Regions:
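Extracytoplasmic soluble-region selector
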Residues: 1-82
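Short amphipathic beta-strand/extended segments with alternating polar/hydrophobic composition
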Residues: 72-74, 297-301
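N-terminal capping segments
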Residues: 82-213, 217-223
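Low-complexity, Gly/Ser/Thr/Pro-rich intrinsically disordered linker/tail segments
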Residues: 300-331
Length: 331
């Protein structure tokens, strides 16, 4: 028998639960035993771990013959138990140390690897990490340009977009930027804006963050799905998010069907978002708009719902995923 976890480290918030995925080759009959070195810090039951208090504990899976695998589980106060909380404050400038920024990156990376890079579950994990587990809201920022220029954009990297792995929380990441226009500035720090819309005035500085497609492409890329640093759409002459997957018009009947899933795109012209959850009444839409990167709870059962006023289509991403599991779990 051979046992191995998908990760050797995993981060949790106090009160948060997660399922550790593993591979086991069993010869004949055998029973696998779970244990936690410190049950007061991390409890475990049939592969589901729960953060009980701050600290670390090794979680083990053994077969009784001496073969076992271990994961170091770290319960940290940097992460929040994932609940829908629209009262989060916006991320301030330089909120975290370099060491703390690395923890966020490692926490996200190990969650993705635990689910399997390129899978639907990995994308959902990524969406929920930034909108629920991360303790602040990322600000909306109109992009100053992108890596995919399409001859109409400035070439800019990390200005309202971030097509790189991890969170943009440390100035050590400036060295990874391919091009700058008005930056660089990490998320939450002031950056010169070029857009003239509402409170946004050209030449004024606002906290750097993500625009709508900046958030969606960041989430896809971090989950292991490389669609490129592209915009929302719809433009018949340019590759954009509306070209990814299989497009379906968002009607009441379609929204109430079983044809689409959590982890699919939901959008309207010029705006793109991701479905972060679904229950028997509501869709939970993860998006970046003027309120920041957050989850909007909207009814699909009510025919007069804002869902049908503000969104126009759903793009099924079945073909984009390496593993296309139907993700029914909420947070």
């Amino acid at each position: 028998k051979s046992i191995s976890f998908h990760v050797d480290k995993y981060y949790l918030a106090v009160g948060e639960k997660a399922k550790l995925n593993y591979s086991a080759i069993v010869v004949g009959e055998g029973h696998l035993n779970w244990s936690s070195e410190k049950e007061d810090i991390v409890s475990v039951s049939e592969g589901e771990i729960e953060g009980k208090s701050l600290g670390t504990s090794k979680v083990s899976l053994s077969d009784g013959t001496g073969k076992k695998a271990e994961v170091l589980v770290i319960v940290t106060d940097l992460l929040e138990k994932p609940v829908l909380n629209d009262k989060k404050k916006f991320l301030p400038c330089k909120a975290f140390t370099e060491e703390e920024a690395l923890v966020f990156d490692e926490a996200l990376e190990t969650r993705i690897k635990n689910k399997g890079e390129g899978s639907r579950a990995a994308l959902i994990e990524t969406i929920r990490f930034l909108t629920l587990s991360f303790p602040y809201k990322i600000s909306y920022f109109y992009e100053n340009g992108r890596l995919t220029q399409n001859n109409v954009r400035n070439k800019a990297d990390g200005e309202g977009r971030y097509y790189h792995k991890g969170l943009f929380l440390s100035e050590n990441k400036f060295k990874d930027l391919v091009a700058t226009h008005k930056g660089p500035a990490i998320w939450g720090c002031p950056l010169t804006n070029l857009e003239d819309h509402g409170k946004y005035k050209p030449g004024s500085k606002y906290p750097n963050g993500l625009d709508c497609s900046g958030f969606v492409t960041w989430a896809l890329y971090n989950a292991g799905i490389d669609v490129g640093d592209i915009g929302a759409g719809i433009d018949p002459n340019v590759k954009d998010m509306s070209d990814i997957g299989e497009m379906h018009t968002l009607t009441y009947d379609y929204a109430n069907s079983d044809d689409y899933h959590v982890g699919d795109l939901i959008a309207r012209w010029g705006h793109t978002a991701l479905i972060a959850g679904k229950d028997d009444q509501y869709l939970y839409i993860a998006e970046s708009l003027l309120k920041g990167v957050r989850i909007e709870k909207v009814s699909y059962k009510n025919k007069n719902s804002g869902l049908y006023k503000y969104y126009a289509y759903i793009n099924k991403l079945d073909e984009e995923y390496i593993a296309n599991d139907d993700y029914l779990e909420m947070w």
